[in-house]
Each structure stands twice: as C-alpha cells, then as structure tokens.
UniProtKB/Swiss-Prot annotation:
CXXCXGXG motif repeats lie at residues 149-156, 166-173, 188-195, 202-209. Homodimer. Zn(2+) 1 binds at C149, C152, C202, C205. The J domain is necessary and sufficient to stimulate DnaK ATPase activity. Zinc center 1 plays an important role in the autonomous, DnaK-independent chaperone activity of DnaJ. Zinc center 2 is essential for interaction with DnaK and for DnaJ activity. Its cofactor is Zn(2+). This is Chaperone protein DnaJ. HAMAP family: DnaJ.
Amino acid sequence: MAADKRDYYEVLGVHKNASDTEIKKAFRKLAIQYHPDKNPDDKEAEEKFKEITEAYEVLSDPQKRAQYDQFGHAGVGAGGFSGGGFGGFGAGTPFGDIFGDIFGDIFGGRPRGSRGRRGDDLQYNMELSFEEAAFGAEKEIQVPYGKRCGDCGGSGAKPGTEPKVCPTCRGAGQVRFQQGFFSVSKTCNHCNGEGRVVENPCTSCRGSGMIRDTKTLSVKVPAGVETGTRLKLSGEGGQGIKGGGNGDLYVAIAVREHPIFTREDNDVLCEIPVSFVQAALGCEIEVPTLDGKVSMKIPEGTQSGRIFRLRGKGVPQLQGYGRGDQLVIIKVETPSNLNKRQRELLEEFARISGEDVHPMKKSFFDKVMDFIS
C-alpha cells in the first residue's frame, strides 16, 4: 500500500528542493552501497536497493517528480516501477548512463572504446661495481621497448584504411546483458574492449600497432645505491597508443662482490690480517679504504676480532648528507712452518709465562692460539 512507503526524498537522503545533480549523486552512492552484486545473499540489501531505485525512477523524471510532490505516492501509482518494472535499465531510461557508471565502479572497469592506452612499464637490470654503487656513476644502457608503428601510426590498420566500429558492442567496448532484474556489462570479446576492430591489419606490426625497437639512454646512478635499489625513469618505458602516455623504465641495481670490502647499511667492513708479533707489540699499518690507503695504529696487546672505526670512510647516504664509517676487523695470523730457532723462542716465552706446552697435554699451536686470542 502507498501508505506503507517511505518518503522518496527520505529514501535518498535529500531535501525536497534538491537539484537533479544532488538526487543523482545521492542515488549513485546508495546504489553502489546496496547493489546485490556487491551484497550477495543479503535480502535486506536487495530490498534497500529496490527501494532507492524506485525512488530515483520517480525523482529523476521531472513529470513524475511534479506529480509526486503534489499528490504523494498516489500521484505516481502504488505499484512502484512503471512500464514493466525493473527490466528497463537500457538507453532511453533514467538509469542508462548512471548504471553504466555504477557497474564500472563495482566490477572494476568501464568501456574503453577508443581511449588511449598507456605504454608498458619496463625493467632494466644494471650491475655495478662496489665503488660505482658507493660514489655514483653515469652509465649508458641499451633498452628494448615497444613503440608505435610508423606505417600505421599505432592504429594497427593497413595504411589507407581505418579500424572499423565493432559490430558486437557498437564501439562501446563492453556488451550489456540482462541477468534477472539487473543489467550487467562485460568486456566485449570481439574487440577485447577496444570498441574497434582491424579488418585489414598493417603488415609491419601485424595489426598490433606496436613494433620492437632499442633506444640508448644515459642513466645517472646516485651515490649510495645498493643491491635492490630501483631507479625510476619516468616516460622512458614503452610508448602509449591512441594518445596514451608512455610507461616508465625501472633500473634494478645489483652490486658485484668486492674482494676486500663488504657493506652493512652505509658502513664498509674489511678484515685486516696482522702477525701475532704485531698484535702483541703494537704497530702502524696501512688500511685500504674507498678513498685510498690510510695509516692506522694498532695498540699493543690487540686481540683477534677487535674492531677499529674509521669515521666518514663508509658509503655516502643515498639522497642525503654524510657518509657511514669503515669498520676494520683485526685478524691475528698464527705462524706456521716454524724453524727450530723460532720454536725454541716461543717455547721459552711459554715457560717464562708459566704456560705448559707439553705435547701430551696441549699442542704448541693450541697454546699459541690461546695466547693471541
């Protein structure tokens, strides 16, 4: 009964003086929220959707709205939908355009027709030396990419011809069919959503509109990159077609291993061997760094594994300021192939130190290792 129906303005959440744009906006928001395809097996949502759709059918039609404003529900009939109810969502009804938008939002796509298509994003794998990664470099690379066919201008059609409007979707890129109460759209299989079909393909690109080519680019690698860093070169990917923008090129960095240095964040690590005599008595040694050799003092009694820090000798901060440090790890070398005199001196040292070097209890080399570690 008409008396049981809610006020149509209340259903859509608008005031009685709302403009057509406000009514359409309110309906679109509610239709997306309560659409049965978005709320499967939800009877309450389905009833809500029917209610807001009924309200919109009346309020979006100037003549019906005027009758409703004057006579209420009785002025538009108690039956709700006119002309057969839910079936009429195609062209020529107030639902034609708006339902196309709604289905596009719900199903994640809209008819593409002849709109431009963006070019592909590309990736180039670049290998750098440790030093290039640390201090930056400028590298020239050869990049294969897709570009518009010069013969057909990217249309895919043989020169002198044009793509034809798809006879299946009539250029919309999508076809619409009835599913129960609702009109559902899907991508046209005949034209793959393009809205046009090529009857006479270009022989150069075989109808794709694109050809393969190679371009030379100069890439400025900033200081401080590491394995896994990706540099983005905007617009240097594949070319777009039909006015679409170019894709981007991503340069993926891989850094080769260094024979001396390793890296932790922005710090550089290296191991420096010293003899057990140098470690015991102290000395001054030369240490390799990314900037060249520097002198470093080893204090007497230095143990194997001790770490010395050379500040500011690490890797520069990527897109920032300052540098990390270099960590020098001391490795005390155990002597081997001792001659008789060297052995005697070490044994004498052990006796003076009160150490037992009897071979049955502990080997000589074990004692030396205990001494220097």
